[in-house]
Amino acid sequence: MEDSDDSEAKLREEIEAELDKISISSLENDEVENDSVSDTQSDSSDTDLLELPESVLHYINVIKNKSKTAEELILQDVEDTDIFSDYKKGCNHGTVTDSHMHLRTGSLPESKANAEQLMKILSVIEKEEFMRSLAPSARCVSVREIITPDTPMDEYILPDEADLSFGYFEVEERCRKSFEAWQDKQQELEEKDKETLEAQNEREKRTFQEEDEKRQCWMRQFEVEKKHLEDLQKQDQDKMNDELHKEEKIWKEKYRQHEEHIRNLHLKMEEERTRLSELQEKEKARLFKLRYDAAVKIQATYRASVTYRKYSPIIKEQMEKKRRRAQELKEKEAKIRQKEEEKRRRLEEEQRVEEEKKKKMLEERRRREREYEEKKSILRQEREEQRSKEVIRLREHAHSPLIITCALKKGDCHGKQQAIAHVPKGKGTIAKESVDSNSKKQEDACLAQQLNKRENTHVQQLAMKKSTGIKLKPNQAILVELKMNEKNESLPKLKINENLSKNQCSEQPSDQEFNAENVDQKNELENSNLKESVNEQYPWQGLESDTQTEEHVEHVREEKVGQETEKLFGFNQEVSAEDSKQAQGVMEETREGLAEEIEIKEMTQQGGPSDENNSSPISMQKSLPSLTPDNPEPVERSVTLEEDQETDLKSERIEEIPEEGVLSCDAAVINADASVHTEGEADLQDSASGKLAPSEEAGSHSANNLLATEEVEDSPKSEIQEALEKGQQTKAEADGVLTCSVSQLTVLSSVEERRLAWVKTFKPWAEIFEQNQHKKIVKKRRLVKCPPNTMPPLDPSAILQYGPWKSLKQVPVITFQGLPGCSLSTLAECSNLQILSLRRCGLTSLQGLSHCTRLKYIDAQENHIEAISCENLENLSVVLLNNNLLTSIHGFDGCTNLQSLELSHNKITRISGLESLKYLQELTVDHNQLISTKGLCEAPTIVYLDCSHNHLTGIDGIGNCGLLQIIKLQGNYLREPPSLRNHVLLRELHLDDNSISSVEGLSSCWLPLLQYLSISQNSLATIVPLFHLVSLEKLDVSNNCLSDLTNVMCWFNACYSLRELCLTGNPVLQEINWRDSILKTLPALRVLNGDMLNSYANDRIEEHYHQDLRCLLALCQYQLQEFNLLPEKYITQKRDILTLHAVDRLSQYYKDLMKLSHECRRAHEQGDVNTTERSAAETNKNHPDFSNTDSALQNKTLHAQTNSCEADSPATSPNPLDTVFRPSTSHCEELRGRNQEKLMAHKSEQSRISSRSNSRASFIEMKMADSPMSNHHNAERSSPTKAAMVIQAQWRSYIAHRQINCSAEMHPTTTEPLQDPLINNQTTSNEERRKTNMDIQEQREKAALHIQAVWKGFILRKKLATARKAIKDEESGEEYEEIDLEDFEFDEDALEKDWPALDSTGFPSQTLPLSNQLPWPKNSRTLRHDETSPTIPVRPAQAWLCNEKENVMSSEYTQLSSRSESGILSWTPDSKTSRKNLLQSEKEEKISEEWGFKDISTAQQMLKRAKKMKSKKLRKKLEPSVRLALFKKAKNKVSVTKSSKKTQLRRDNYFEAHISSQDEEEEAVSKATAAKEKLERSQEYTYQWLHTQVGFPEATSSRNLKCNHFLPELDPDVLNGGRVQLVARLVSREDTDLDLFSMTSASALSVNKDKKSQTHRYSTGSSSKLWFPSELI
């Protein structure tokens, strides 16, 4: 088919090409010739329109059969000769043949376009013919015209065929018309059909569109309805879900509350059980104590009676001595008062004389002033006259040259010379007059100055007289004022004209004499004031030290005279050299004379036999002028006024320190050079002004005491030697307690060796710090993978709604918690931001803070931060990034002021990026993955370092960290301690949970401030000696391999500062005597293995060390105290900082910590221990170290200090006795005179002293405190003195009571004890009667004691047996009642009321009955048994064994059931049980409603537990019958009555075993009902367990029914097909279910929990965290 189409197309193209080539010339000729013929034919063409020619028909047929023609043409051969010949013939003849037309028509395409083309051709032909017919004349012209190629071939007709052409045209016209008509009809028909079809199509389209629209509307309605239904369904589902969630939350909350309540109940039960066991132990101890006290009381009474009989004459003698001494003291006091009165009168007389002198001087001064005024007026008048005369002369001499002529020039010159000569003469006379007047004025001024000086001295003397009670500060202030006045008065003298130098030289001797007199008066006044003040403060030393005080004051006065003269005449050096030389000569002469006189006097005073230590008091006074306690005034030196003022200020500051807080390290202050250091002088002056006065009271320190008192000198030497020997013996005993002791010299040498080694090898901190500050920071580009920022930015409105800010630029604080996730791009606008806290906000990076330049505090804990960008935040101080995902330390470049950085719980492997952190002090990187710490060398300022719980095998980079104070390295893989050769400030070192096997590295380190050392849970088998750690207080070496006790003692030897020691988990604890050995080695130990020790020595640490180490130790203690006080000053809640003020305080704390660390490091490097002596004294002011009050220990300490003081000479070492508080001489005499009293008092300390004796002792102490002899001792009396005073007071009260008892023995008929022994103080006058009654009284006492011992022992044994039985039967606690702990506590007084009061006339005060115990005659019907074999009562067993049902009853019912005996007996068992059941059911229902229990058994169990845990109220002391009834807990309640007669009648039934038949019936019924109820309860439990196993999981969980079930429960998960747990959990289900455990099982559970809670090696968590069971979390 395709081939035919191609051939047809080719043929058509060839035909048209040939037709176009045909020549038209022949056609034109034929047209011209046949014009006429064509006209005729055109005329006849109209008629022939209806006839169609064959060609037209042929065309029509061809059109109709075009398909056939096309097929024929396709099949026709292209080379057919006939067709082409016919075609040529037709062309030659000029006619168009049918074949041509056939070809023309056949060449048209089959489409409609070919038909239209044919119609156009025919129409063109028709128009041509029609035009020819209309214009025949134009034919010729048209023929000659050039035929265009566009002209169709059919228009040209040849002349030979004219006829044929006419017919052809007509037929063709007719055919055309008919064809047009037919075509029009066809077109109309087609249009009609088309219109109908279009209309039908429109209708169909419209219907289809309508249907489509309906369909779309239906779909929309369907969608709307569907959506509506879905919304309704969703709402219903949401409501249902919300309700379900709410119900689930409510049930979960109820479930949690129920679990928590049950857990609390279980914990309370456990606590009650432990408390029960503790109370039982306490009860045992109390009973043992009661027996011990009774035995002690009996022994004390017996010994007291024996002692009284033996020592009664000695006591009388001592009482007489005491009276005589009291009388002597009164006489001394009277003498002292008399002397004081005389001194007062003398001072008043002197004051009166001075006042008279003052009045005379005032009158003289006024007279001189009047004379001065008169002379002044006269001089003024004379001066005015001279001035007027001089003016007149000058005027005359000025006019004289004008009158003289020029001829008389010589005479004129001579006249001028004379005039000039007259003028100087007048000036000279005026100068002389002025000089005379000035000299007179100077004389008057000198007189006035002298008057002023005298007035000032008188005023100052009066002021000093008024302030005689003031010690050092007012006297120094007066001296300074005197010096200021004298200097102010000497200043005008320097401004006097040089012309008056001679007059001054003439007046100088008189001024010197006057000044010397003033100085003498001033010194005398000061010395008198000092003497009076000393006498007022120490009246007991008034008569003893008057002579020495006067001598020493005279010595100081003479020295002051020379110094004052030097100061008063020092200004003469400025006037002239001669005057200065004369003044120096005078000063030297006066000094030499005074020195000679002082030496002569002192040699004469000390010429007698004296000790070697007193041979050089002058040298001691020169080197240590303030050691003499009788001279409170400082020795004046030639220093400036500013230095004096500084000294005064320092002395004032030191005077504020309380007198109890003086340290023993003050001896080191005294050892310093007093002539150089002003601080030392101030301290010594203060100590000399009254603080060291008690040091002279001992009386046994003559070797070191510079000024011994008269009483000590007069006392016999034998007593002194005995006291010294006793002190040496006590010291030897105290020193002999320690084994393997290390001498002080050894400790000193080893400590000093380590310190010197450190001094030689340490790197100066200043150099390290300077290098760190000036190092160049090289910025390294670190490729940190930042997570894509896909989170939304922080909402600005959320930031602004929490404050009064209007824009983000004003926001200073941002705090959020728990945000879903955000980015920090919003914070770029917060330029004023200072605090940023975003916890649990889902942050992945810390970026966008570059514009927050004022940011100080960042808290981004508990996020997912992986990248940090906080560059160039210079104000940033604290950054908290705990619990994130960091893998390295980065992003802090330019944060130069960052001080605290916390990065715990991250994934950091190495420490780096700390180059720019020049002030970093706290770095926390615990719980990371660290394997190296080399980056720490970039931050040498670190103070606190926490690298715990990492993977470290060694610590590097801390060599330059010279300020490190706390290092935490627990939970790593360390094999040895880190190198600490440059860390003198280290205070805490934590090395727990490592693999350390040796600590040899610590032996060579100098760590003077190390307080806490923890090496627990390691592999230590040996430890180095630790005595070189002078400040070590806490040591933990638990869970190691220490096994040798002797080595342990050697390691801990000489560790005098150690207070807490933990050795748990070591094999050494298996030794028998390890505890005693440790306590002997460490007498100051207070806590051993977590247990507080009651008996520990409270000695000072400095006492155990050598004197050369005490200053160093004081420095260390001071620095430690400063470090401990600094956090308390600034920080209260360090990690809850959300205010700007708190952040500023934290920053200031870090700054002060850095400053203090610098100072302490500098002090250690320079070896300057004197810089903190005054501060140490101030520190001890706030923290005084009170010693133990035990008298024996205090005596040991006192004697030891005395002997140590005797060993040192005062010239080579400081006297430690200056800081030891010693008793006064009067007390020393009493102690020496009462040796026997002390022995007896020591024996009687163990006995009990009655309340009267205690009140008497306190009264005596108050009286002694108010007396003038002890005014200065109230604040500074040491504990030994106080202990001695208490012992003496108690001994005196004991003697007074014995005297009272002796007087009471005179009247044995009196049965009531004396209420006031002081009133009834009578002497024994009838000894014979006392001796006869003594035997009878002793027999009575023995009988009474025997009876009491038998009865109390029986009761105690009975109670203990019952308690043991109850404890053994605890496992079956459902059947027995709990043990009432208060039943063990019986009132001794109430029991003793049953016994008559013994006749205590022959007993001392210890056996007297109490004041509230009235004597009661013994009733013969009380006991119904033999004295040798007492019968055991049967009924007391009811006190512990009772009906089980009564245990469930509440306390209210117990109170309601207390009624009379008759009412109880009238009750029947049925009514009793029904009443109990009624109350029980009401109580159970109430509890079930309140707690929401579904099962009544839970309420029953709760009631039982509440009954067991209920604390009983304290019972009042009732009558004996009621007391005994409550004690027995019998079912028959005894009525509470106040009648004494009824109680007397009931005493008959105390010890009778009586059981009535009614009681037996009640017991049988109660047992039957109890068994029945028990069976029903067990059946109910079984039924409940079986029906709740396959129920709802919430209802059947182990926690919910923990208190209800009694059988082992099944897990609901197991019933639902879950897995069965084959491996037990950390805490099994039975451990938490405490209802099934008895007391023994509970104790086993606690042991198991303790074992499980022990920390394991290489644990990931901190050892300080608490462990909880999985069910309880």
UniProtKB/Swiss-Prot annotation:
Domain IQ: 291-320, 1280-1309, 1340-1369
Residue stretches of biased makeup (Polar residues): 603-629, 1168-1226, 1308-1325
Entry annotated with the keyword Cytoplasm: no
Keyword line: Leucine-rich repeat, Repeat
Ranges occupied by LRR repeats: 34-59, 216-239, 491-516, 641-665, 830-852, 853-873, 874-894, 895-919, 921-939, 940-961, 962-983, 984-1005, 1007-1029, 1030-1054, 1067-1090, 1378-1405
GO biological process: apoptotic process; ectopic germ cell programmed cell death; gene expression; single fertilization
Biased composition (Basic and acidic residues): 326-374, 549-567, 588-602, 647-656
Superkingdom to which the source organism belongs: Eukaryota
Protein name: Leucine-rich repeat- and IQ domain-containing protein 1
